[in-house]
Amino acid sequence: MKRITLLIFLLPLLAKAQPIINLEDFDYQKFQWGYYFGINTLDFRVDYQALDYTNPPLTDIQTKRSYGFNVGLTGDLRLIDHLSLRFEPGLIYNKRELEFPFLTQQTDRKREVLSTYIYIPVLLKYGSKRWDNFKPYITAGTSVGINLSANNKSRSDNSEGKFRTQPIVYFYELGFGIDFYTPHFRFTPSIRGLFSIDNELIHDSDPASPWTGNLKGIFTRGVMINLTFE
């Protein structure tokens, strides 16, 4: 009788000691799909033709970091244990502002740079061993962005208020996140750095343009925070 009574009291403790494992075979599926949405913050790295020490303000171009959004689909192809190939096509939207404080006219000092990227990344995802219902991971890869707002075909340039950029940009990416396994789906918050490989600048027609004359190139850099459901 004492043993039965002791067993009754121990059962709840044993149940707590053995957590329920959600989606136990999820990581062994050959292919998984889902969707994501999130926010981004982007700015430009600005490279100059030459540092003009006789007139320092000419190199003092300021990039105002701004916030936008990301949305897209995910496909995950299992390669081996802990390693998968991910395809995450989507849309990235952002509106940045370049400021040229050395220009005197107020209408000349600021230029908006719209970015509406059709975003096509291919990434490798390496995950740690799963701990109960969560698993940390890292990602690395490359992507291409097709900017629908590049103004590259416009004949107008900064002299008429249009800052032009290249329509196709290649990036490299590094990131990390945590997979959480719920009873019905895998939920993943992640952070990813995005860095352009290509110069996105299209120079103005005038080689001595105060907006682009001393610029060697501009390169997107930013951070994306996504919530993924698979």
Which residues does each PLM region occupy?
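Predominantly the C-terminal beta-signal and adjacent terminal strand-loop region
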Residues: 167-169, 177-230
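Bacterial Sec-dependent N-terminal signal peptides
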Residues: 1-23, 227-230
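Gram-negative (and chloroplast) outer-membrane scaffold detector with strong preference
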Residues: 27-31, 39-45, 74-151, 226, ...
